[in-house]
Structure formats: C-alpha cells, structure tokens
Amino acid sequence: MALKATIYKATVNVADLDRNQFLDASLTLARHPSETQERMMLRLLAWLKYADERLQFTRGLCADDEPEAWLRNDHLGIDLWIELGLPDERRIKKACTQAAEVALFTYNSRAAQIWWQQNQSKCVQFANLSVWYLDDEQLAKVSAFADRTMTLQATIQDGVIWLSDDKNNLEVNLTAWQQPS
C-alpha cells in the first residue's frame, strides 16, 4: 500500500511592499512522503515571495510535466512557473519556453553551489529566469515554522522576507543568483 501525502494548512497574510501586493489566503500543501519538511516550507516561501490570488500549487513531485506552483492566466497560459531544486538544462528550457516568467529556488548549500557553477552559463541565456538560493541555516529556520495548521504573516520589503507566527519572527534573505534581464 502506497503512503499518502500529509496535508498542511496555512493561513497567510502577505504584505509585499516591493510589489504593492497585499493578500490574505488559505493554502493547502500536500507533503509527499518523499518530500522533506524543509522542501515543503521552501515551496511555501516561494509562494509567499510571488503571492497572488491565482498562484496555485500543482501536483509537484507527482508530476514531471508541472512546476511546483504556477500562475495561469485566463487563456490557460502560464504567467509564472515556480521550480524548486537543481533542475537540468532541459527542464529549465521547458519552463522558460512555456512561461512568461520562471522562478527557480535552489537549496542544499553544497549541491546548489556546485550546480550553479556548472549551470550558470546555461541559465543566463534565459531572459525570463530568476534563480534564488536559500542557504541551509536559513532553510532550517524557515522549516521551524512548519505545523499541520499554520498562521503566518509575511512582510516583504527590499527583497527581504520577514516571516512570523505567534511564537517566532524570522528575517529571510534569499540570494539572487540571477534576475530577469
């Protein structure tokens, strides 16, 4: 018998001062049995960074043809494709040709640094690609917010994400390895 996903619920309040975006949302995250808590929380952090009422989580690890989250327009085109991890060039190219904007969130300090050294020259050819990096220490702190039922406040200003719940406050600094040109 296959293991089932664990369901997490997040009620979020986002004040993105950089994009003048203010939003309250109730999110459901399905954590696949093979997904770490850190990776799931990075998915949530990516959602917060690009918060929009139309931004949706996809089937994620269960679907090779979909991103972790996407923002689809009224014509079913993809305005934003959010990817996590260390994808190969083929996957990046697919995302960048299908979506108007692509945001890649990398993690796992040692592997991510090596991946970036090997793929930086390939990534720069995609003008609609952002590559973000979150180091292990910060990811562990973000992961500490994980709970089956979460109520989170995120304030984003000057690229910094201030994350808080009823017990914790955290300043999250994503490193921009590449921004769209």
UniProtKB/Swiss-Prot annotation:
It comes from the Bacteria. Pfam families: YaeQ. Gene3D superfamilies: Restriction endonuclease-like alpha-beta roll domain. Transmembrane segments: none annotated. PANTHER family: SUCROSE PHOSPHORYLASE (PTHR38784:SF1). This is Uncharacterized protein YaeQ.
